[in-house]
Amino acid sequence: MSTSKAKQPSVPALDNYIPDDEDFFDPFASPTNSPNQSPKAKGGAKRSEPDGGLGIDEEVSVAKRARVPRVKLDETRLLSDKGIPALRKRAGTLRLKGKGHEFSDAARLLSFYQLWLDDLFPKAKFLDALAMVEKAGHKTTMHKARTDWINDLKPNMTAPDNDGHADIGHAPVAQPQSSRIAPIFEKRQTIDASTMPAEDSNGVDDLFGGDDLGEMYDVTPKATRPVGEPDDDDIEALMAEAESSIRQPAPIAMSLFGSGRPAKTGTEAQRANGSPNDEDLDAVMAEAEVHTVSHGSSTARKQRAQTDPGNDDDDLEALIAEAEGVLKQKPAPSHKTKDKTSSFDDEEAAMAELDLW
């Protein structure tokens, strides 16, 4: 009996089984640290649950990202080593075939520029890069650099002295030229002067050779000289020139022997040299009159045709009448008696010279 009474729990021990804390039954209450909890668990709870429960009051530090500089295709990049200087070096390797290979040459030229722009500015497409290069090419810095490149390609105007230094203070001495050269060389100089490339608006030649590509493909437009009927002023000037050549008195040159026959007269000298005589002058005047009459009649016919297009028969009859009148007015070539007298004088002079011998 004594052992059973000792094993029964006491009443106060049963009452202490349920804790007296009112927050025990509160589901939203934060857990409290029990006294039997280990120190490591207490420290972990402090690290995981800062003050305030949610960590809103803490200051968040955000590291700023380094900004990469934006690369632009401007005049500075064009003047760099990968810009136009590299393009000038690569231009020596470009070979074009010329006429008959226009398509392949154009494709080769486009690929040449595309590879250069891909190395210079790979970020942009080919057409966009070309637009950027064109925009940057209008800057003052690019104009100055272009002028310097062109001046570098020009030959030096001053020749170096014996010491190896160029004479800057004195102008270059021009080479003496003969006053008379052969006609074939005159023609060649005229052709060379007409085919020389003209300078651009800034007074400098083109950096890439001007119209060399146009001459290679024979597509350079050439100015065509207008071919039309000569004006009345030209005809009058031609007639006046022929008359003045006849009216000029020709000097009579004496023979070497003094009293012998005179040398050829001015008229004979002109005839020997191919100068126009009276017959040639008459022919020129007749041709000019025919041309003037035909030109005037054609102009009148055009005006008449514009005003009254139904008078074709009248125009034909008028044209026939004008042609007959011109044929009647044309002077016949007259043989002067001067030729006979001059030949007679020549014979007498020859006989006189024979008598002197």
UniProtKB/Swiss-Prot annotation:
Q: A single GO BP annotation from the record?
A: replication fork processing
What are the GO MF terms of this UniProt record?
DNA binding
The record's annotation in Pfam families points to: Swi3
Coiled-coil regions in this chain? none
Report the principal subcellular site. nucleus
Annotated spans, Disordered: 1-58, 255-357
User: What are its GO cellular component terms?
Assistant: replication fork protection complex
| Domain of life, per lineage | Eukaryota
Biased composition regions of type Acidic residues, renumbered to the chain:
344-357
Residue stretches of biased makeup (Polar residues): 30-39, 267-276
Give the similarity note. Belongs to the CSM3 family.
What role does it play? Forms a fork protection complex (FPC) with TOF1 and which is required for chromosome segregation during meiosis and DNA damage repair. FPC coordinates leading and lagging strand synthesis and moves with the replication fork. FPC stabilizes replication forks in a configuration that is recognized by replication checkpoint sensors.
Assembly:
Component of the fork protection complex (FPC) consisting of TOF1 and CSM3.
Protein name as it appears in the record: Chromosome segregation in meiosis protein 3
